[in-house]
Amino acid sequence: MRNIKLSGREATLVRAIGFTEPMMGAELQDQTHMDSEDVTDTLNSLMSAGLVESVPYYDEVQLAEMPVTAFELNPAYAQDLRQALYRR
C-alpha cells in the first residue's frame, strides 16, 4: 500500500474523475471551475505519478488536447486514492 498525499487541486480532480468511468477533460474543467492551464498541469502531474491515465494514452497531455481526452483513475491505485481523499 502506498501513502499518497494530494494537493488541493489534485484532490479536486481525483474527486471529479471519480472511480467508475472515464471523464472528458472539458467536463473536468466545467465541474471543477479551474482554468484550463491549471487542469492540464494538474492532470500531467497526476499522470506522471501514474495515478491517472488518459484515453487515448499520452505521456503528457497538451492544452489543446485536454478537452477532447478522457481521463480515468489508475485502478491499481484506486484504494490508495480513496484513503488519500478520506484523510483530507
Name every feature range the model reports, one short phrase each:
Residues M1-L13:
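Short alpha-helical segments that sit at the start of domains
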Residues M1-R2, D30, T69:
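Residues marking the start of alpha-helices
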Residues H33-A49, S54:
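Short amphipathic alpha-helical interaction segments
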Residues A16-T20:
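Short helix-capping/hinge SLiMs at alpha-helix to coil transitions
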Residues V68-R88:
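Short, amphipathic alpha-helical interaction segments positioned at domain boundaries
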Residues P56-V68:
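Short, Lys/Arg-rich nucleic-acid/phosphate-binding segment
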Residues P22-Q31:
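Short acidic, hydrophobic short linear motifs in intrinsically disordered regions
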